Amino acid sequence: MDVAWEVIVTQPAVEPTGVDERVVVARAAALSLEQKVRLLTGADCWSLHAEPAAGLRRLVVSDGPAGVRGERRDERDTSANVPSPTSLAATSDEALVEDVRCLLAFEARRKGVDVLLAPTVNLHRTPYSGRHFECFSEDPLLTARIGVAFVRGVQGGGVGATVKDFVANDSETQRMTLDAPR
């Protein structure tokens, strides 16, 4: 990794607090069940609730397979656009993927994003899928290797990564309303 980038992406998104882990555990134990459940729900589309009693600020998430969207939908708030996950996987170059994902971490930090909702590790199962641009490959081993490099790159840059869509994320048609039968 280039030295200049290393300095930028290795700094944590939030400065370490120096809080002892025992203090964190004690604060979490002091929360009611309702407060704990609230920490798992969305405050809005792109953030989780703060819990001041536990010293937790609002947590911001964003989509990020090929660039960081951020909270705002404003064309003046641009983001670096990197190659799609499929293109990166085609290189089979884990070090390259890790470096590119460090750039995404930098973008996320610049936009105040704590966690990227990526990578998508669904496999390419059919050529008709409308979601392939988010996925790495039809090869499970390559997907695993590149997915790990993705997570290492993003989290090495001080931003969380959410591995998602393990299977059956293939449909673009009615994807917001499609529900699997029980």
Q: What is each residue range found by the language model?
A:
Residues M1-R182:
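Glycoside hydrolase catalytic-domain context in secreted enzymes
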